[in-house]
Amino acid sequence: MKKKYIFFFVISFSLVRLSAQLPVGTFREHLPYDNFKSVAVAPDAVYAAGETSILRFNKQDKSLSTWSKIDGLSDVGISKLYYLNEKNTLIIAYQNANLDFVKENQLLNMPDIKNKQIIGSKTINNFFVYDNYLYLSCGFGVVVLNTDNFLVKETWFTRTANKNYEVKEMTASRNKFFIATDDGLFFTPTNNPNIADFSTWEPLIEAGNGNYTALKYFNGNLIAQKYDSSVGTDSLFVYNHNDWRYIDEISYEELRAIDVRGAEMLICEKYRLKVHDTQFQLIYTVNSWYNRYYENGQDAKFDGTDDIWIGDRVNGLVKINRRFNKKEFYFLDGPHSYLAHQIDSRNGNLAVVPGSNVNYQKSYTQGNFSYLYNKKWGICLFSAYDNLFAVQLSDLCCVAINPKNSQEVFAGSWGQGLVQYNTDAPPTLYNPENSLLQYSTVHEGLVFVGDITFDNNGRLWMTNSFCANPICMRQADNRWFSFSLNPYLVGSNVVDKILVDSRNYKWVTAPQLNKLVVFSENGTPSNPSDDKIRNVDLNTLANVKTSTITCLAEDLDGEIWIGTNQGVKVIYNPQNALSETVFAKNIIIEVNSGAQNLLEFENITAITVDAANRKWIGTSKAGAFLISANGTEELLHLNEKNSPLFSNQINDIIIDNTNGEIFFATDKGIISYRGTASEAKEDYNDVMVFPNPVRENYQGTISVSGLMYHSFCKIVDAAGNLVWQGFAEGGQLNWNGKDFYGKKPATGVYYVFSSDETGKQRNVAKILFIK
């Protein structure tokens, strides 16, 4: 393998970013910092890794800082942390075999294994140091690195003609290397001249076959952990180079990690911690560090002091002091889960649910949601309310913040109905027993809510699959109404998305039938006789005959944008939808001097309209696109290679139009981006310039927000000389901070003169430049 170097700085900072304004064109993450899978202990710090980010605890001042892809990490999907004490280096391994080496805030990325074409899994399972070399236990074998420069010395492939062995962990004892694999233990002399030839390795006959997941050297013995998938249990064995035996002195449940230091061995279980001496006698135990129901220990490490560190999936980074039996918990504010299926934003608040209704089957994702309210995350674990609901909630797949009351959030469950959550009251579960939601006629006892949304009057609309009346509406006074979509949807159909447009029309998708139905109760929900309903023709006038509708959006011109499994379609005359058949059409764009339908080769997952009527479009594999108002021009394409975006799988997009921040929900977490358009105002009472003052080292965009729609702006100096001019995008002007000649203005005060489209309303704002 040929070594490549990429150096850059990793920036550490505390998570106070939610209260800080985000400059245009920059990102910030919204990740869980209480959900950790791997821990590494350094002399001055402790590191805890989640799926996408790392929390750093400073031992001296007890401060917390974070690293993610935004701050310089090269990848996402962290699998393992390891601190190489001999080189004062933190090693970060990713699930795709990418590697980062961090020393004194300088990062070296080594993508060699990631980029190599290799048979078998590339996952790096563990690390082992021996004689100035670092050995990586991988899915395909062992990679040997020189710890002086992290160059690859050699690679040992652990495969025979008929089988590939995954190496889970490696150690050395009595001048022999031992490896634990998914099918037994193997060994070879450390000076074996043909060590890269797996046929020269010998199986440890006494260990037999089986999946060995851990291997440690302890007090002259080998300690091996074996997992039996047939019963889902682990066993520990000891080998003293003569005898192989089961360690019956140690009892354990759900064994998660083993650590060895000196004459002590640490055992970490899901909710219990134990320390044993060289005779395997128990010398210290913690039966619970918080509450067994809410504990999920994943990794644990000795500190060399009286402290033990635990990475917990629920409680963050846990420190246990053995001398005083004291427990401390370290975490930062954030959502509960990396999974983000749907999000909603209102007035600077953000709600997210992790469940889904993919393929319209239950996945039994844990029922919870997270809510960023007044710049603080709140988490609702519905298992805490089981005594109220008498049901274990799962698959919360849709969420909506009440536009009339930001303290109130609703979430729909694919199987259990609708949850009403208030920040200062217990939640309420709605099902057929206390609402007009209906049980499925196909799946006994289940209530399938696929999507929810509020109309302009504060009424909540939702889809209800597999029943006679697939649309329900709840008023603020808790009066319920349900609606039939006959004759277009009859019987037990899946109804998924619902959009309430500016005309109060309801657009409803039936994905398995490839139907889009438009419906109006005509303002009289209790009188079905005046209801109107029609079917939309999706394919007759379209260039691409699609089979599945995935999402809906209304733009500022009232046009209906439709996301499908093969690109985007638009209904240009939706005002006629209830009086005549309307047709969906593709958008034709120019590509390499030819014509092509907009994103016709992409599965569209989300469409959101910004304050300038541009469209943010999410896809399942290609990231996110910013498209011009009419859809004919690609303005920006964000993906995991050209941006900090965590994943190319975009599940949802929502915009906080008060500041132009765009939130992307992905399968690996939420990330936001400050766009160039924000909500237009009706006057100039709330104009704000950011940043202000503009410091000498600032190179980013200067934004003037709070403007009236499409304001014309002129920037002049104190003498009245024109420096630059332009139009606002929605209610926001974006300026690169340079004059017409590309030069940064001199130190001084500059004035932004703004006027609306009529020229009747005007405003003046000031900017201070420091050069």
What kind of region is each of these model predictions?
Residues 106-107, 148-150, 189-195, 280, ...:
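Short loop/turn segments immediately following beta-strands, especially the blade-tip
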Residues 712-723, 750:
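Short, glycine-anchored, charge-dense loop/turn motifs used at functional sites
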Residues 22-42, 68-86, 111-130, 154-173, ...:
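Short coil-to-beta transitions that initiate beta-strands within beta-rich domains
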Residues 69, 728-760:
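Short, surface-exposed loop/turn motifs with a glycine/proline- and acidic-biased composition
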Residues 10, 14-15, 682-714, 732-735:
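Glycine-centered coil/turn sites that cap beta-strands in beta-rich domains
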